[in-house]
């Protein structure tokens, strides 16, 4: 199942902290891909995503949780360093990166504050919950801004995204290390069902063949999880008695 073009990768968090991190990663990636705003549709998509990120950041102690995880990953690398045959140059490089990310994150302004204080984002956020509430008569500020030179708009967006760099860099290295901590292993589900112990994992990663058009419904926590495979076509689709897939507990 190594052909990535014929498979699809799903990820499922096993705790609230990981759920928040995956959502932040998803939103940060969207913001980065939408940074060129040249029409009302792209602008609204960007500002809606920025609004979602503000909401996610306000729900917990994001900086504290990330700093704790950066420290935890450094401790794990220290354990690796004591094992025979380990690539010490790689371990030292990762530890240096983790320390650097932690230092930058610690000294950074409050995460997301630049987004919250941005006047344009604030004005747009007030209208997002209103159906059709972003017309030119609702948001003349936005429509005027969209008629500014592209370079001026780019500078505005670049400044906002740069303010998120400490968050983005810390989150990226943490999630990369967590994802790499557990290899994908071949598994088989019986009659569309699979369950196992999570053993304190944070994240499940599951790779499925695109055919026969199934998706996983996952429930679980840090000690145990269950996966039920369901057909995309709920009326005519079928689930094979034995389904091969790959699974990683990270």
Curated annotation (Swiss-Prot):
One Pfam family cited in the UniProt record for this chain: ZapD
Q: What does this protein do?
A: Cell division factor that enhances FtsZ-ring assembly. Directly interacts with FtsZ and promotes bundling of FtsZ protofilaments, with a reduction in FtsZ GTPase activity.
Q: Which family does it belong to?
A: Belongs to the ZapD family.
State if Phosphoprotein is listed as a keyword: no
Q: How does it assemble?
A: Interacts with FtsZ.
Biological source species:
Yersinia enterocolitica serotype O:8 / biotype 1B (strain NCTC 13174 / 8081)
> Which InterPro entries does the annotation name?
ZapD, ZapD_C, ZapD_sf
What main location does UniProt list? cytoplasm
Entry's Gene Ontology BP terms: division septum assembly; FtsZ-dependent cytokinesis
Question: Where is the protein situated, by its record's location annotation?
Answer: Cytoplasm
Question: What's the name of the protein?
Answer: Cell division protein ZapD
User: What is one cellular component GO term in this UniProt entry?
Assistant: cell division site
**Which gene holds the coding sequence for this protein?**
zapD
Q: Which PANTHER family match?
A: CELL DIVISION PROTEIN ZAPD
The answer to whether UniProt assigns keyword Cell cycle to this entry is yes
Q: Which UniProt keywords apply?
A: Cell cycle, Cell division, Cytoplasm, Septation
């Amino acid at each position: 199942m190594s052909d990535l073009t014929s498979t699809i990768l799903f990820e499922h968090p096993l705790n609230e902290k990981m759920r928040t991190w995956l959502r932040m990663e998803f939103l940060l990636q969207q913001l980065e891909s939408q940074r060129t705003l040249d029409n009302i549709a792209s602008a609204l998509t960007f500002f809606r995503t920025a609004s979602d990120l503000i909401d996610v950041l306000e729900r917990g102690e994001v900086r504290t949780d990330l700093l704790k995880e950066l420290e935890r990953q450094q401790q794990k690398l220290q354990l690796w360093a004591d094992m025979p045959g380990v690539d010490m140059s790689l371990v030292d490089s990762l530890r240096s990166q983790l320390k650097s990310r932690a230092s930058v994150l610690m000294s950074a302004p409050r995460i997301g504050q630049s987004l919250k204080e941005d006047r344009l984002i604030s004005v747009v956020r007030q209208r997002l919950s209103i159906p059709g509430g972003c017309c030119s008569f609702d948001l003349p500020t936005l429509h005027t801004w969209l008629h500014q030179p592209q370079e001026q708009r780019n500078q505005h967006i670049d400044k906002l995204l740069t303010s998120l760099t400490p968050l983005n860099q810390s989150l990226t290295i943490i999630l990369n290390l967590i994802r790499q901590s557990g290899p994908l292993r071949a598994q088989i589900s019986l009659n569309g069902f699979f369950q196992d112990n999570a053993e304190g994992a944070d994240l499940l990663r599951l790779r499925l063949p695109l055919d026969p058009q199934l998706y996983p419904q996952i429930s679980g926590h840090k000690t145990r999880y269950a996966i039920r495979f369901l057909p995309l076509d709920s009326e005519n689709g079928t689930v094979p008695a034995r389904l091969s897939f790959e699974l990683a507990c990270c």
